């Protein structure tokens, strides 16, 4: 059975920023953290026998989510810029 997740939001953010090697903007963090926590909760519900779904796993999962969200923001902004340029 997986251990209880005990890491606070501030601790998680500090560890994710350390893992990524850079500061995370608030707007990006506010979307990424809840998504990663929800994703881990779903994994834990589906596979309760897995014992490595712990705080460290949440750090890695959240770091991936931050990267994915930032990339999504970038591609959406690029698409909007291309579409705006085409309409002129």
Q: Positions of the model-derived regions?
A:
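N-terminal segment of the canonical double-stranded RNA-binding domain
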Residues: 2-71, 75
């Amino acid at each position: 059975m997986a251990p209880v997740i005990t890491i606070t939001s501030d601790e998680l953010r500090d560890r994710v920023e350390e893992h990524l090697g850079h500061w995370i903007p608030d707007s990006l963090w506010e979307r990424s953290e809840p998504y990663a926590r929800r994703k881990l909760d779903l994994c834990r519900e589906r596979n309760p026998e897995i014992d490595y779904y712990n705080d460290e796993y949440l750090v890695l999962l959240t770091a991936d989510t931050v990267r994915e969200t930032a990339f999504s923001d970038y591609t959406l902004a690029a698409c909007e810029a291309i579409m705006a340029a085409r309409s002129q």
